[in-house]
Amino acid sequence: MTVKIGINGFGRIGRLAFRRIMDLGEETKDIEVVAINDLTTPAMLAHLLKYDSTHGTFDHEVSATEDSLVVDGKKYRVYAEPQAQNIPWVKNDGVDFVLECTGFYTSKAKSQAHLDAGAKRVLISAPAGNDLKTIVYSVNQDTLTADDTIVSAGSCTTNSLAPMANALNKEFGIQVGTMTTIHAYTATQKVLDGPDRGNNFRNARAAAENIIPHSTGAAKAIGLVLPELNGKLDGHAQRVPVKDGSETELVTILDKKVTAEEVNAAMKKYESPSFAYNADQIVSTDVLGMTAGSIFDPTQTQVITAGDKQLVKTVAWYDNEYSFTCQMVRTLLHFATL
């Protein structure tokens, strides 16, 4: 039986999820997007789906009616309901599963509104706290069961970090580590200098003109994906003046002494559609549109030895929009059919 999907929030991730599901074709035969909820008009949603400043023009016929998005002749009903519990898509469209992409329903308690409205399952496209499973596909998707109803797909950085940390820990054991994500700016930042609602002085500065230190919970969230690493990793972000394309640098102290060659060989061992390996000397624009959650870069591996102590640095690239979306869709396909 086909699982019917409603996308709540048709912003950067919601639209890219729709694109990815369409582009996968027969691979998504077990699911069907039937409705969208977003607080703007179908005409605006159609325009933003078709034309994307980062990922290019969507290669499908896209138009809109008064109450629908139309892609390749198929209608997708559009709602503009601000309260999740009031979206009538279960009754009207048979929605079974909500892909929650608004950035607002980012907890078990908040996303419960979708279940109260009749949906059976919810996948949140953001970190969502300690009381929900956080799933990074290729690392811990096997922890999902048919009894799970609300699950988090984590963040783009967690999806970049987890495969690399998992490989290091399984092969060599991680004692402690710190992560830095060199991260593209996002829609929550300022185009020009201006007051920040949270009174964060750095967030008040122009995103495309500055390197801006920023917090991230991605490293701490690794404990939700890999419990054996809980409390062992922390980190921060540097938001940089690029619109997309990021990298994660992880510096660790390991249980075993290693060489750079041994570390790279270990990463190669864990290569998968979710965790790629590329020895070319790439830069950030080269990873735009990549479908892996991250690409390990062996050219940047460093092992620094001082006596009997070592620091090990490993690096993975990721498209902070599309890599995460592809990972989320992998989780969606797995979760929806349990």
Curated annotation (Swiss-Prot):
Organism annotation: Lactobacillus delbrueckii subsp. bulgaricus
GO CC entries: cytoplasm
SUPFAM superfamilies assigned to the protein according to its UniProt record, in alphabetical order: Glyceraldehyde-3-phosphate dehydrogenase-like, C-terminal domain, NAD(P)-binding Rossmann-fold domains
Residues engaged in binding D-glyceraldehyde 3-phosphate: S155, C156, T157, T186, T216, G217, R239
Subunit relationships: Homotetramer.
Subcellular location(s) of the protein: Cytoplasm
GO biological process: glucose metabolic process; glycolytic process
Reaction equation(s) it catalyzes: D-glyceraldehyde 3-phosphate + phosphate + NAD(+) = (2R)-3-phospho-glyceroyl phosphate + NADH + H(+)
Site (Activates thiol group during catalysis): H183
Keywords in alphabetical order: Cytoplasm, Glycolysis, NAD, Nucleotide-binding, Oxidoreductase
A Pfam family assignment: Gp_dh_N
Protein name: Glyceraldehyde-3-phosphate dehydrogenase
